[in-house]
Regions:
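Beta-strand-enriched, solvent-exposed domains that form extended recognition/catalytic surfaces
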Residues: 81-197
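Arg/Lys-rich, alpha-helical DNA-contact motif
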Residues: 8-9
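A structural signal for multi-pass alpha-helical bundles of membrane permease subunits
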Residues: 2-4, 14-81, 85-91, 104, ...
Length: 460
């Protein structure tokens, strides 16, 4: 009689090593996936801080992420307006800005032509309403110079040469004769130098070079620390203005989105909880048909029904109103979620309350609803996210005036105004990142309620 050989058993230590190795590989895979996803987010955020986020190659070190530049920006902002955080140029402002040029040996380093130009804040609507310019109040003078030298490698021979350098210290002061002048957000500066000279260092990096490097241009030499880092984010608020009122359009878009999102959350919770409880507990003719219609409505794209819905809103005079966007998709899948939750709610509790004389609505209002907070929170989060990110219906129903748009449709307006030929993608990226902050904060605060096990624990 043949005997089957016994299976070889691995030692306990070997099994543990295999388990640890398997766990380590899984852990590394998840870390790699998280790094790729988070890395893309981080790079996009870093690009939103840049003046030119489309630059090639993409630099990882620049003034907006350099602590030394933060301190310099704070010092210049404090000297210009007494505000180290947001900077500016105000009466009493007096600052010194240093730049260093170099030239080949034997070449005299000349003083560059310095100017505080009459420059508008950007390419947006603020340029049409801006009235105060630093050039009207700034007194520019050369405070002094100092000579030095630096080592430069010759690309042709590979040898190191000693080139002379000269540092120019420019003083920019607010005109004392105009001491009652306004606070000005920006202090631009341009320096035009001969082609033989090269700018090698400055207190703040130039915003751009023009005329093949002859002209070094700064949009603002008094930014303050936060003004330097979050310049694009500040511009989103200050430069997107309503020409008729002068108010910030982007701030109004954010407010409109909050109103619509909270309005849809309230109506969704009210209607979905009532409809879900009715479908889960009340037995009446046509209940299954209604539930089937609810499921069927979830399969129909919004683009299929938007013409009929648009005509209805037009006939009722609801176009260009926030209420139309709130009610257009107020229930849908939320009824299904609430129905599933109520079906798992213990019937014994409801029956005991009915025996004690409580009405059906009283059971729902006093017993079922207070114990449904996990499901309500999940529905509220989903409704808020859907309303906040909704683009199609606000685009169709909200067309005028410009301050009536939501933030998602407003971002399209930013893209048309600042992107494309203007190429001001830093501001567009900053607006996009501001728009995701509310949803991101919401998920961070209430993420535990999204998990299904939390819902079941709430029933228990």
């Amino acid at each position: 009689m043949a005997t089957t050989p016994a299976k070889r058993r691995l030692p306990v230590d070997a099994l543990r090593r295999r388990q640890v190795a398997a766990s380590a590989w899984v852990y590394l895979i998840f870390i790699a996936l998280a790094t790729v996803m988070l890395g893309t987010f981080v790079v996009a955020f870093m690009a939103s801080l840049k003046v030119d986020p489309l630059e090639r190659p993409f630099r990882l070190v620049y003034d907006q992420v350099s602590p030394s530049a933060w301190f310099t920006g704070a010092d210049l902002g404090k000297a210009g307006a007494g505000d180290a955080l947001w900077g500016g140029f105000a009466p009493g402002g007096d600052l010194t800005f240093d730049v260093t040029f170099t030239a080949p040996p034997g070449t005299d380093i000349e003083e560059p032509a310095a100017e505080v130009p009459r420059r508008r804040p950007g390419t947006g609507l603020a340029a049409a309403v801006m009235k105060d310019f630093a050039s009207d109040y700034a007194l520019l003078s050369l405070a002094g110079t100092s000579d030095g030298s630096m080592d430069v490698t010759n690309d042709a021979t590979g040898e190191t040469e000693r080139w002379p350098t000269r540092t120019f210290s420019y003083r920019i002061a607010y005109d004392p004769a105009k001491a009652d002048g306004p606070w000005i957000e920006r202090t631009p500066l341009t320096l035009t130098s001969p082609t033989s000279q090269t700018l090698v260092s400055s207190d703040l990096s130039p915003t751009r070079f023009e005329r093949r490097g002859r002209v070094a241009s700064w949009d603002n030499i008094t930014p303050g620390a936060l003004g330097l880092i979050f310049n694009n984010y500040r511009r989103v608020i200050t430069e997107t203005v309503d020409l008729s009122t002068g108010n910030s359009l982007f701030a109004g878009w954010l407010l409109n989105s909050f109103v619509i999102a909270f309005g849809r959350v309230i109506m969704t919770i009210a209607l979905a909880s009532l409809a879900g409880y009715a479908l889960a507990r009340l037995k009446f003719n046509g209940a299954r048909l209604i539930f089937a219609l609810v499921l069927f409505s979830m399969t129909i794209p919004a683009q299929v029904t938007f013409v009929s819905n648009y005509l209805i809103f037009r006939d009722f005079g609801l176009l260009n109103t926030q209420f139309s966007v709130i009610i257009v998709l107020v229930v849908g899948s939320h009824v299904l979620l609430m129905k599933q939750f109520f079906e798992n709610f213990p019937k014994e509790i409801e029956e005991a309350a009915i025996v004690d004389g409580t009405s059906r609505f009283g059971v729902f209002w006093r017993i079922v609803l207070p114990n449904s907070m996990p499901a309500i929170l999940v529905n509220a989060i989903m409704a808020f996210q859907a309303a906040w990110n909704d683009f199609f219906w606000p685009l169709v129903l909200l067309t005028s005036p410009p301050n009536a748009l939501t933030v998602q449709v407003g971002l399209l307006s930013l893209r048309r105004s600042y992107g494309g030929a203007q190429g001001d993608w830093g501001l567009v990226l900053a607006g996009a990142f501001i728009s995701i902050v509310p949803v991101l904060v919401l998920f961070i605060l209430f993420q535990r309620y999204i998990e299904s096990n939390q819902v079941s624990e709430g029933v228990k």
